Amino acid sequence: MEKKEIKVTRGELYMADLPEETVGSVQAGKRPVLVTQSNWLNEKSPTFLAAIVTSKLKKTRMGTHVVLPQIPGLPKRSMVEAEQRYAVDKAQIIRYIDKVDDSVMKEVTRALHRSEESDEVTKNRRHSHYRRKKMELGQTGN
């Protein structure tokens, strides 16, 4: 692949050509990706970290998924899968699509944190959520 002098920015969507050699649920081929890496690192590196964007809206309430508003350049309503991240070489970029707004990027950042948090943090967050729900329903006990 030829080296491209492309400046990518956190929050930008690109169509990228990802390697086809994958197994299981790992995404591959020509597909949209969202730049998640910090801008200072994007400037210094020929690669960047990106989350997969898919038009298959499954498990939309999963804490690592963020449904995007309708975006020009994406043929269908799509979703970011924060748990599916890649190191993408800038030479793999096919074209620029668009940039998501700050409120969407905040949701994506939360989803990225959830995908990387420890099991203990996840367990505590879930326990707190269920305890709150029980209180709302007027139930007591554990």
Question: Could you describe each region identified by the protein language model?
Answer:
Residues E2, I6, Q70-N142:
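C-terminal terminal-subdomain/extension
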Residues P19-V23:
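Short, charged beta-turn/beta-strand-edge "cap" motif at the junction between a beta-strand
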Residues S25-K30, L34-Q70:
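Compact nucleic-acid interaction/catalytic patches
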